[in-house]
Protein backbone atom coordinates (compact mmCIF):
# COMPACT_ATOMS: atom_id res chain seq x y z
CA UNK A 1 0.00 0.00 0.00
CA UNK A 2 1.34 3.39 -0.99
CA UNK A 3 0.11 6.38 0.99
CA UNK A 4 0.93 9.91 -0.04
CA UNK A 5 -0.37 12.60 2.28
CA UNK A 6 -1.24 16.02 0.96
CA UNK A 7 -2.93 19.06 2.37
CA UNK A 8 -5.51 19.14 -0.39
CA UNK A 9 -6.35 17.49 -3.69
CA UNK A 10 -8.88 19.20 -5.91
CA UNK A 11 -10.49 17.63 -8.94
CA UNK A 12 -12.49 19.83 -11.26
CA UNK A 13 -15.46 18.10 -12.81
CA UNK A 14 -17.97 19.23 -15.36
CA UNK A 15 -20.55 17.82 -17.71
CA UNK A 16 -20.21 20.57 -20.31
CA UNK A 17 -17.19 21.92 -22.21
CA UNK A 18 -17.61 25.38 -20.69
CA UNK A 19 -15.04 26.15 -17.96
CA UNK A 20 -17.41 28.65 -16.34
CA UNK A 21 -19.68 25.73 -15.41
CA UNK A 22 -16.86 23.74 -13.82
CA UNK A 23 -17.53 22.60 -10.27
CA UNK A 24 -14.67 22.14 -7.82
CA UNK A 25 -15.02 19.13 -5.52
CA UNK A 26 -12.82 17.76 -2.77
CA UNK A 27 -11.16 14.41 -3.37
CA UNK A 28 -10.28 12.46 -0.24
CA UNK A 29 -8.28 9.66 -1.82
CA UNK A 30 -7.44 7.88 -5.05
CA UNK A 31 -7.22 4.10 -5.35
CA UNK A 32 -5.11 2.68 -8.15
CA UNK A 33 -6.11 -0.84 -9.15
CA UNK A 34 -5.26 -3.09 -12.10
CA UNK A 35 -2.53 -2.94 -14.72
CA UNK A 36 -4.14 -2.02 -18.05
CA UNK A 37 -4.20 1.73 -18.66
CA UNK A 38 -6.33 2.17 -21.73
CA UNK A 39 -8.33 5.39 -21.84
CA UNK A 40 -9.57 8.37 -19.90
CA UNK A 41 -13.30 8.46 -19.27
CA UNK A 42 -15.49 7.97 -16.20
CA UNK A 43 -17.60 4.98 -15.27
CA UNK A 44 -19.91 4.54 -12.32
CA UNK A 45 -18.27 2.57 -9.52
CA UNK A 46 -20.25 -0.66 -9.09
CA UNK A 47 -19.62 -4.19 -7.85
CA UNK A 48 -19.09 -5.21 -11.49
CA UNK A 49 -16.05 -3.01 -12.10
CA UNK A 50 -13.69 -5.88 -11.24
CA UNK A 51 -14.93 -7.57 -14.45
CA UNK A 52 -13.16 -4.83 -16.40
CA UNK A 53 -9.44 -4.81 -15.54
CA UNK A 54 -8.84 -1.49 -17.31
CA UNK A 55 -11.13 0.21 -14.77
CA UNK A 56 -8.21 0.86 -12.49
CA UNK A 57 -8.50 4.23 -10.78
CA UNK A 58 -11.07 4.76 -8.08
CA UNK A 59 -11.69 8.24 -6.75
CA UNK A 60 -13.46 8.99 -3.49
CA UNK A 61 -15.37 12.23 -2.98
CA UNK A 62 -16.43 12.43 0.67
CA UNK A 63 -17.41 8.77 0.82
CA UNK A 64 -18.84 8.35 -2.70
CA UNK A 65 -16.47 6.37 -4.90
CA UNK A 66 -16.08 6.50 -8.66
CA UNK A 67 -13.91 4.73 -11.18
CA UNK A 68 -12.08 6.09 -14.21
CA UNK A 69 -9.52 4.63 -16.59
CA UNK A 70 -6.23 6.25 -17.40
CA UNK A 71 -3.90 6.48 -20.37
CA UNK A 72 -0.26 5.52 -19.93
CA UNK A 73 0.50 9.10 -20.88
CA UNK A 74 -1.86 10.33 -18.16
CA UNK A 75 -1.09 8.30 -15.06
CA UNK A 76 2.59 9.26 -14.77
CA UNK A 77 1.87 13.02 -14.98
CA UNK A 78 -0.96 12.45 -12.51
CA UNK A 79 1.34 10.89 -9.93
CA UNK A 80 4.03 13.51 -10.53
CA UNK A 81 1.41 16.19 -9.97
CA UNK A 82 0.38 14.58 -6.70
CA UNK A 83 3.99 14.33 -5.54
CA UNK A 84 5.12 17.81 -6.52
CA UNK A 85 2.26 20.31 -6.17
CA UNK A 86 -0.61 20.95 -3.82
CA UNK A 87 -3.44 20.89 -6.35
CA UNK A 88 -4.21 18.62 -9.25
CA UNK A 89 -6.80 19.49 -11.86
CA UNK A 90 -8.39 17.02 -14.21
CA UNK A 91 -11.62 17.00 -16.12
CA UNK A 92 -14.21 14.27 -16.46
CA UNK A 93 -17.90 13.67 -15.95
CA UNK A 94 -18.83 12.23 -12.58
CA UNK A 95 -21.97 10.09 -12.10
CA UNK A 96 -24.30 11.11 -9.30
CA UNK A 97 -24.54 7.87 -7.31
CA UNK A 98 -22.15 5.09 -6.43
CA UNK A 99 -21.98 2.22 -3.93
CA UNK A 100 -19.15 2.20 -1.40
CA UNK A 101 -17.64 -1.17 -2.36
CA UNK A 102 -13.84 -1.27 -2.73
CA UNK A 103 -11.74 -3.58 -4.92
CA UNK A 104 -10.02 -6.48 -3.15
CA UNK A 105 -6.51 -5.58 -4.32
CA UNK A 106 -5.52 -1.96 -4.29
CA UNK A 107 -2.94 0.71 -3.72
CA UNK A 108 -4.38 3.76 -2.03
CA UNK A 109 -3.24 7.35 -2.27
CA UNK A 110 -4.73 9.16 0.71
CA UNK A 111 -5.06 12.91 1.08
CA UNK A 112 -5.81 14.80 4.26
CA UNK A 113 -5.18 18.07 6.06
CA UNK A 114 -2.62 16.74 8.54
CA UNK A 115 0.47 17.74 6.57
UniProtKB/Swiss-Prot annotation:
Contained within a telomeric X element core sequence. This is Putative UPF0320 protein YKL225W. Belongs to the UPF0320 family. It comes from the Eukaryota. Pfam families: DUF468.
